[in-house]
Regions:
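Structural/interface elements that position substrates and couple domains in central-metabolism enzymes
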Residues: 1-116
Length: 116
């Protein structure tokens, strides 16, 4: 499972109170393989999980190495994610928890979650 965004909000490396960290912990308990990307918070995350998860330097790599992906932090670069990129996921399932993307492509499974 690929996670895009680890910090509690964009433009910071702060992972304290980050939902992403709690989700990683839960996924690891369920024996899931987790792969992550974040422009700034990778090193702070690595201090917690060490080699228990995989780390990507480029967010695009998440799509080639994951069954599904979840957007957790609304980083500016993630707004460039295309349905073509999502189709590289084995399940073609992409979950946007921040409602920053919109797709009309019937060949992918796109779920947009959020409050309101």
């Amino acid at each position: 499972i690929g996670l895009l965004g680890l910090s509690f909000k964009e433009n910071t490396d702060d992972i304290r109170e980050s939902v992403s960290i709690r989700l990683i912990e839960h996924l690891l308990k369920k024996k899931c393989k987790v792969i992550v990307h974040d422009p700034k918070a990778i090193e702070n995350t690595r201090k917690i999980f060490l080699k228990k998860i995989m780390y990507c330097k480029k967010y695009e790599d998440i799509f080639e190495k994951s069954d599904c992906a979840v957007l957790m932090t609304p980083w500016k670069d993630y707004k460039k994610i295309s349905s073509k990129l999502i189709k590289k996921l084995q399940s073609k399932l992409f979950i946007d928890t921040r409602r920053i993307l919109e797709f009309d492509d019937k060949e992918i499974i796109f779920i947009s979650l959020g409050i309101g």
